[in-house]
């Protein structure tokens, strides 16, 4: 007979752009169980990307159950739960029925570009940069909320009456986990977010960590819709949904990229990581002093512990990373599955002069060109699918180089090495390309899915399962290092070719 052990594990829900995952870690920080499930990507029009919030909630319940059953544990054995999520993705729902008024508008969606141009006016997209750390563009949540209120029949009137709630995905998940319309104990569910997610809305003042009435008024968003902002690490509420994690306390909430930084042990000023997921996201811890970028990066909050000052970060966000490989698989059908791209790309020594610029929804950091669209340059009769596959991998490495260069200028010093995570870092060829194009070591950890592990660490810290960040750092180990194997002359020549290719993507929309 199995003997249960109270509070032996920490759980994490990782609600990502393409799938939802649940993991359990033990006291050594090892993943002992994991389950995941993909959800539909909805493309109603060119440039529009949506998800079904109710499908995602169903998937969350499914993966939590699967992960628990696989190791035969009970809620009694779970010390706490952490939640991490795709950031900026926007849900608006009726607080009386729990029904979304529209699909979730995903962070990649560009339908709000015209709204953003109007708001930015003559001052341009940097108008609120000093206050929010963000540019006025289609990326943050604020313009997405405005679009829903202006375009969904009756939504604005319902919002002004106080009947609608807004949340990024963490808020939607927390609201449902704590009972939804009515908790099982009769209490209302919590309508909250954490500082990292709130910092991605274009509605929060980074210095006060509070919603800014002036920004809300400028976007015509009723503040009654907005969730309470709380620190990332601390007590939220126990799960009150009649499900497999009933009564487990929720003690950590982080946006996905901040969770990855946490999972990499990025607790010290200057620590940096790059996540190779659906997009590419480079974050550098800048300590408790807010630094506003002068080179096309965003300023954000890395995390905040209850009772402590927030820790800030610089971020370079690239919209197309792993999703470019998915496009090669699903749209062009050049590979049967994502991992197959590595072997195909290895069949040629170089890209044959081909470059793929994945500006499918414009270019994000550090260029911020919403007018750009995807292009393939350098095609000749010599080029084949192997060259295109190699160019797709190189596009990820070159885009990262752009962000690393911008971050070095903002920080006043170059990175000495780069820690990486995400599904794509299993691709050894891509990691060698990255080291070559950066000219620094690239380090991969033992567990490459640091987003889920990171928020599990945060929840463990919030519940006392882990006592200090020093304890967490000791659990993190580098598994493999790639050293640069390219001359400086070759590196800069290749980078110049990439920059010429990118210029061909401009003025297309």
UniProtKB/Swiss-Prot annotation:
It catalyses: glycerol + ATP = sn-glycerol 3-phosphate + ADP + H(+). GO terms for cellular component: cytosol. Glycerol binds at residues 87-88, 139, 256-257. Inhibited by fructose 1,6-bisphosphate (FBP). Pathway: Polyol metabolism; glycerol degradation via glycerol kinase pathway; sn-glycerol 3-phosphate from glycerol: step 1/1. Its EC number is 2.7.1.30. Sn-glycerol 3-phosphate binds at residues 17, 87-88, 139, 256. Pfam families: FGGY_C, FGGY_N. ADP binds at residues 17, 21, 278, 322, 423, 427. Gene3D superfamilies: 3.30.420.40. It is an enzyme of class 2 (transferase). Transmembrane segments: none annotated. ATP binds at residues 17-19, 278, 322, 326, 423. The keyword S-adenosyl-L-methionine does not apply. InterPro entries: ATPase_NBD, Carb_kinase_FGGY, Carb_kinase_FGGY_CS, FGGY_C, FGGY_N, Glycerol_kin. Keywords: ATP-binding, Glycerol metabolism, Kinase, Nucleotide-binding, Transferase. GO terms for molecular function: ATP binding; glycerol kinase activity. GO terms for biological process: glycerol catabolic process; glycerol metabolic process; glycerol-3-phosphate metabolic process. Key enzyme in the regulation of glycerol uptake and metabolism. Catalyzes the phosphorylation of glycerol to yield sn-glycerol 3-phosphate. Belongs to the FGGY kinase family. This is Glycerol kinase. The lineage of its organism: Bacteria, Bacillati, Actinomycetota, Actinomycetes, Mycobacteriales.
